[in-house]
């Protein structure tokens, strides 16, 4: 299982340990902000993740899954479309679109906006941010900000770019679980998850959408403590609501990663590849 954090850049050690306790091989690594990497999520080659997937195969993983949160979910969804052999994706607080960069690229610049991702040397089509947006009402100086409105405003401004920037989950053969909270203050993850689910269903492909109206951007799985507060951003939800959503999603996550019980919920497990035992 490849475990990807979002724009925090955190290596998901705690989450990997939770999965290891369930008998899974789990791996997380730094994919931006390290030596020789772009300092921000700016034109990250999606090929960056392929060696980690090969490491999991070398350790005998019989199913390859990617668990991503926020921008990590954006990467996970793209990988399931572009890389062969990914069996399952769990996208937590996902987006249905490719967005512009978050932070600077290798040139040290954040502007002009560029795609967050590249594939085979070419940037993926993306939605830029409309810098005319401002929070309304304005928060007190120095207080953390909810930036969900920026994404909603940018979708309206650049409506002509949404089609090209849509993540083509209808072309992914991976089993898919989406986890999203309706009170997400970072971006509109629940409406975006609903868009992803609709694309899958229209293509006749399985999907599970696990949602809670009162949860925020950072659902917490059983065994994880509350997410720390940020001095810069509001994430929505509450410790109780975020933990409840994570607890509800956890068995679905385990099912799809193991390839078990899927037929009961409209998810048909993919055949297990013949590789060394885990």
Outline where the language-model segments fall.
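Short beta-strand element of the alpha/beta-hydrolase
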Residues: 1-6
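Short beta-to-alpha linker loops that shape the active-site pocket of alpha/beta-hydrolase fold enzymes
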Residues: 7, 25, 30-35, 95, ...
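Primarily recognizes the serine-hydrolase "nucleophile elbow" in alpha/beta-hydrolase
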Residues: 9-10, 14, 54-128, 149-160
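Short amphipathic alpha-helix adjacent to the substrate-entry channel of hydrolases
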Residues: 11-29
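Residues at the C-terminal ends
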Residues: 20-21, 58, 171
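Catalytic nucleophile-loop/oxyanion-hole region of alpha/beta-hydrolase
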Residues: 32-65
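Serine-hydrolase catalytic core
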Residues: 129-218
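C-terminal catalytic histidine-bearing segment of alpha/beta-hydrolase fold enzymes
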Residues: 191-194, 203-277
């Amino acid at each position: 299982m490849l475990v990807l954090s979002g724009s925090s850049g955190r290596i998901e050690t705690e989450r990997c340990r939770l999965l290891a306790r369930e008998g899974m091989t789990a791996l997380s690594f730094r994919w931006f902000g390290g030596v020789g990497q772009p300092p921000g999520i700016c034109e990250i080659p999606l090929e960056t993740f392929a060696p980690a997937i090969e490491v999991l195969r070398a350790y005998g993983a019989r199913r390859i899954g990617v668990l991503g949160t926020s921008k990590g979910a954006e990467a996970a969804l793209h990988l399931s479309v572009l890389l062969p052999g990914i069996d399952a994706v769990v996208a937590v607080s996902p987006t249905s679109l490719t967005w512009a960069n978050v932070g600077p690229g290798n040139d040290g610049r954040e502007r002009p906006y560029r795609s967050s991702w590249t594939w085979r040397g070419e940037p993926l089509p993306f939605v830029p941010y409309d810098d005319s947006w401002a929070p309304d009402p304005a928060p007190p100086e120095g207080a953390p900000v909810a930036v969900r409105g920026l994404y909603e405003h940018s979708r309206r401004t650049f409506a002509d770019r949404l089609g090209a920037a849509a993540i083509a989950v209808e072309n992914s053969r991976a089993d898919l679980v989406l986890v999203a909270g309706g009170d997400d203050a970072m971006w509109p993850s629940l409406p975006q998850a609903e868009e992803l689910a609709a694309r899958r269903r229209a293509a006749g492909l399985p999907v599970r959408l696990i949602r809670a109206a009162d949860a925020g951007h950072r659902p917490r799985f059983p065994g994880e403590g509350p997410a720390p507060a940020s001095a810069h951003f509001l994430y929505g939800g509450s410790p109780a609501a975020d933990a409840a959503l994570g607890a509800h999603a956890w068995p679905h996550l385990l099912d799809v990663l193991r390839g078990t019980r899927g037929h009961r919920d409209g998810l048909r497990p993919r055949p297990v590849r013949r590789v060394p035992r885990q």
